[in-house]
From Swiss-Prot:
Belongs to the natriuretic peptide family. The record marks 122-123, 129-130 as: Cleavage. This is Natriuretic peptides A. It comes from the Eukaryota. The keyword Secreted applies. Pfam families: ANP (PF00212). The keyword Signal applies. Keywords: Cell projection, Disulfide bond, Hormone, Phosphoprotein, Secreted, Signal, Vasoactive, Vasodilator. Residues 1-24 form the signal peptide. Residues 50-108 are annotated as: Disordered. Disulfide bonds join 129-145. Residues 25-122, 92-102 form a propeptide. GO terms for molecular function: hormone activity; hormone receptor binding.
Amino acid sequence: MGSSAITTSFLLFVAFQLPGQTGANPVYGSVSNADLMDFKNLLDRLEDKMPLEDEAVPSQVLSEQNEEAGAPLSPLSEVPPWDGGRSTQPREMGAPSDGDPGNPPRSVLLKSKLRALLTAPRSLRRSSCFGGRMDRIGAQSGLGCNSFRYRR
């Protein structure tokens, strides 16, 4: 009797699975072939309307578009180069410069702060609960927050 119940339940399981293979994925079952063809036609029309990246756009067309926008683009030669956040204006006599041994550059300070955050024992990147600690449940069993620790 036990083997017949197992056989019957297996046959019922297979019978329900075979006719509706798309039943497990309702997204694919709800999209018909006609809808897929409509999407394909729409995509083809959009690709036809969009210019290819390889085609060169004439400069006259670009200048007309700039005039329509109302603000012509400034040439790149007028833009000063980026100096890494340092001011090009001369410093005052009493102000320390970036090269003083007593004042390290700002980038060195930022790097040291980032390094300290990364090496901190309770770093937020290692916590699955945003730094919170579950004292009762997860501390000893590994079921709560911070159950997976990175090993070095």
